[in-house]
Amino acid sequence: MINGVFLREIASILRCDLSLIISEFEYELLTKTFRIDAEILFYLPFLAEEIEKNTTSFQKRQHFVSIGNFLHEPNWQTVLKLKQIWKYIRKNLPEAELHIYGAYATEKVFQLHNEKEGFLVKGRAVSADEIFRKYRVLLAPIPFGAGLKGKLWESMKFGLPNVTSSVGAEAMSRDLPWNGFIEDSDEEFINKAVILYTNESIWNQANENASVILEQVYCKTVHIQPFWTTLYKITDHLDNHRNTHFLGKILQHHQLNSTKYMSRWIEEKNKNLLL
């Protein structure tokens, strides 16, 4: 876990006056495991300004959907997993289709397209909002990747229940009931996808769960005022804040000096080249 990228990110946090952390899991990891001072961190997740109540009903929706740009490796691996398990879902629901959306889809992605199997690669979505409003179930067997998943948050906003993995649901809902199902085994994932697609009462309950999650975890009014209070407190006492968290000053000092001496080295090297 501790590698060059990790050390660079921790150093960046220490050099900053305040870092915004969108995941409670990562916030606790930083404060409890790596002992980063909570005064230079602020938990600020995705913010839901207004919760949409009149979402498209179960009966007016159809088909499964997966969405995510293909520059992000977990999205590609998610689609590969769906390609493996889709035939088993399709066996139970022969009229259902799975539509795959995502920007930057290359030829290898479009090669997965198979109309006979009902596995349709659509490419870039013109309007993500429209996508979330017309499908019945979002499938997201995400195999790896940290942080909050935007597609799952959007699915809550637009009344689109989902089946995802424990990685996908990480830090998304605290301990509140999920808006769908969280399954890591292929067998259970397939089973829950079929149930969520066919059982209207379970589907409606999933949407009720989504409303609760949005109100208790992502409500803008809950988070925004404490954020501004913290920001103004730091800016009003900036020198004291920086002196208290002197590790950041040490790192900035060494970073600036390393740049200064590197520039001198380059100057001397260029002089020698001109001789």
Where are these regions (language model features)?
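Conserved catalytic-core segment of nucleotide-activated headgroup transferases in glycan assembly
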Residues: 32, 41-133
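Helix-loop-beta element that forms the nucleotide-linked donor phosphate-binding surface
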Residues: 13-15, 20-21, 27-47
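C-terminal amphipathic helix plus adjacent low-complexity
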Residues: 202-204, 211-275
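Short hydrophobic beta-strand element within catalytic cores of glycosyltransferases
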Residues: 151-155, 161-165
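Acidic donor-binding loop of glycosyltransferase active sites
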Residues: 17, 133-147, 158-160
